[in-house]
């Protein structure tokens, strides 16, 4: 992703307006403005505008995980690739764009999400996004693309896992697949 961004003229690790991004989790309660398309795992779009902010974690959270006092959040809007609609007010984990790692573990995300549901607190919850210039076939699962470039990975797959990987990758293409083998 960073190599492709560099080729496109992006000079920083940080997200920029025009970046292609992908959601890494389902957020069924967040829908686009016109078509009411939900934000799901694998939703791809273009970052249209944003600002960076920092949120304080609530007391109950910091008591349980004292090493995390606050989280950098990118608040922005995304133009959907599939239908030119917009998702607005997305609260994205800034660190995940920079390092590829979420600031919060799944257990911490669950804790903070449940806390917000109980209290009705409108605090920002960091959602998982990353760049979408090159994605794994697992991230593309459920989506379809005109052209797919698939590398036959040299992982220690069992035979059936290797076949599932190839099947998942190949079936993402609607027009053309290029398979790069060893």
PLM feature spans:
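Core RecA-like ATPase module of SF1/SF2 helicases and allied nucleic-acid translocases
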Residues: 1-182
């Amino acid at each position: 992703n960073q190599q492709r961004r560099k080729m496109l003229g992006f000079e920083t690790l940080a997200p920029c307006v025009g970046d292609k991004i992908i959601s890494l989790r389902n957020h069924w309660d967040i829908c686009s403005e016109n078509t009411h398309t939900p934000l799901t795992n694998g939703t791809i779009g273009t970052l249209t505008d944003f600002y960076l902010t920092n949120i304080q974690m609530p007391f109950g959270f910091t008591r349980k995980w004292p090493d995390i006092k606050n989280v950098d959040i990118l608040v922005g809007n995304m133009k959907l690739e599939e239908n030119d609609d917009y998702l607005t007010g997305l609260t994205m984990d800034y660190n995940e764009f920079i390092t590829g790692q979420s600031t919060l573990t799944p257990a911490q995300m669950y804790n903070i999400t449940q806390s917000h549901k109980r209290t009705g607190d409108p605090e920002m919850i960091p959602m998982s996004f990353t760049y979408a210039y090159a994605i794994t076939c697992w991230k593309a699962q459920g989506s379809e693309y005109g052209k797919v470039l698939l590398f036959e990975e040299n992982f220690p797959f069992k035979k059936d896992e290797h076949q599932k990987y190839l099947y998942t990758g190949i079936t993402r293409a609607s027009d053309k697949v290029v398979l790069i083998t060893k």
